[in-house]
Amino acid sequence: MALRACGLIIFRRRLIPKVDNTAIEFLLLQASDGIHHWTPPKGHVEPGESDLETALRETQEEAGIEAGQLTIIEGFRRELSYVARAKPKIVIYWLAEVKDCDVEVRLSREHQAYRWLELEDACQLAQFEEMKAALQEGHQFLCSTAT
């Protein structure tokens, strides 16, 4: 049976003053162990938790961002399937926007660094094709639903 994990693809909209436009930036965390890969916050589902509860708890634990500091974006949910440490894994991601683009990120010991990145740079850091695709799909979803 596949391991099940859930997380949030967290983003902010940063104003670019000179061009009077906004840029979407994604939050990626760098793992402290293994190959030091970059991903959004995520973690394993605990007994009695819903998938979304898991995603919110893991975001608070790994990045110090609480549920009240986020807006979950309706209509976007992606399920990634891959092999991690020789075991099948399923990770479900939702999109979430920080309410304050200057929110403080407080890393747990599981991570050693974080970065806010525009799509192209985020995809370069995300080493796994499934994660790159999820970031691209999230960006496309946000651009297509912008008001």
From Swiss-Prot:
Keywords: Acetylation, GTP-binding, Hydrolase, Nucleotide-binding. It comes from the Eukaryota. PROSITE patterns: NUDIX (PS51462), NUDIX_BOX (PS00893). It catalyses: P(1),P(4)-bis(5'-guanosyl) tetraphosphate + H2O = GMP + GTP + 2 H(+); a 5'-end CoA-ribonucleoside in mRNA + H2O = a 5'-end phospho-adenosine-phospho-ribonucleoside in mRNA + (R)-4'-phosphopantetheine + 2 H(+); a 5'-end FAD-phospho-ribonucleoside in mRNA + H2O = a 5'-end phospho-adenosine-phospho-ribonucleoside in mRNA + FMN + 2 H(+). GO terms for molecular function: bis(5'-nucleosyl)-tetraphosphatase (asymmetrical) activity; GTP binding. Catalyzes the asymmetric hydrolysis of diadenosine 5',5'''-P1,P4-tetraphosphate (Ap4A) to yield AMP and ATP. Exhibits decapping activity towards FAD-capped RNAs and dpCoA-capped RNAs in vitro. This is Bis(5'-nucleosyl)-tetraphosphatase [asymmetrical]. It comes from Bos taurus (Bovine). The gene is NUDT2.
